[in-house]
Amino acid sequence: MSESLSYCLDQIKESADSIATLYFKPPGIFQNALVHNSKTSYAEIITRLIRDADPVDEMSLYMTDKGGKLRRKDGKQGVYDHLTERAATLKRARLLGAPEETPIVHVPKEFYLKQHDIITKKKQRQNRDFLFDEFSKESGGMFEVLIKKFAGDQQVRNLLLALQNGSVITGEDASSRRKTMFVEDFSVELILRLLREIVTQWPLNEHRTKYEHLLQTYHDISDATNKLRAQIADQEHRLQSQDALSEEPDADDDDVAHPTSGVSYLIQQELDEIDALERELEQLRRDSRT
């Protein structure tokens, strides 16, 4: 009984020491899989696992130059090389007594140009619905064909550039400022004209069906809009006629016309109807944009 109690007390003391010193015994799977030699320290094993590289392969990638600095054998330089060179330059200038530069990291211009090209390519939109490929000599995409087709039509060319890049910068407007146009800024007629050329050059049934559906929808909305405009014009004409009939000159009020209550009611009714038609017209315009 006393031996078992002593054993339990020893285990408790060992656990307390482990918690106090933050030392925990590695699990058995780690011991069996990685520690093959009792003389090998855990620090070496963990360092090798974190680096995850073969020392022989590392040495084959780097070399030491005349100044004792590590360089890649393929000649490529990164941010570390640039910072190391800058630190050496600052140290040399400090020894010569030259004024120190401001603590700003000067990134080479080539790095910014490369990043700009990558970002520009990512921003290029590819409309796979109508098989728009990237503009390149190898692909021979539709953009190249369409731009050559509409070489003399600047509006269509601007629309193609907006489809490819998301937006296009046009010439100066009335305020002498350069104008940025997006795809939704172009007229519906111009977009349908471009789609008609696409389904003509590449006559696929799927694309033609979509184009005909869009064209029919546009005609329906256009007809409904024209009818509403005609109704609004008719209502305004009737309203003006009622205003002319309701004007009765009064000598006491310097010929100021005062419409009767019945005429005022009709006028208000016509105005309410015009407002309702204008709201319906605005709703049709929003539907056509979507």
Swiss-Prot record:
Protein name: DASH complex subunit SPC34
Family: Belongs to the DASH complex SPC34 family.
One Gene Ontology cellular component: spindle microtubule
Gene that this polypeptide is encoded by: SPC34
Alphabetized UniProt keyword annotations: Cell cycle, Cell division, Centromere, Chromosome, Chromosome partition, Coiled coil, Cytoplasm, Cytoskeleton, Kinetochore, Microtubule, Mitosis, Nucleus
Keyword NAD: no
Places the protein is found: Nucleus; Cytoplasm, Cytoskeleton, Spindle; Chromosome, Centromere, Kinetochore
Pfam families assigned: DASH_Spc34 (PF08657)
Extent of Acidic residues compositional bias: 245-255
Gene Ontology molecular function: any one: microtubule plus-end binding
Record-level GO BP terms: attachment of spindle microtubules to kinetochore; cell division; mitotic sister chromatid biorientation; positive regulation of attachment of spindle microtubules to kinetochore; positive regulation of microtubule polymerization; protein transport along microtubule to mitotic spindle pole body
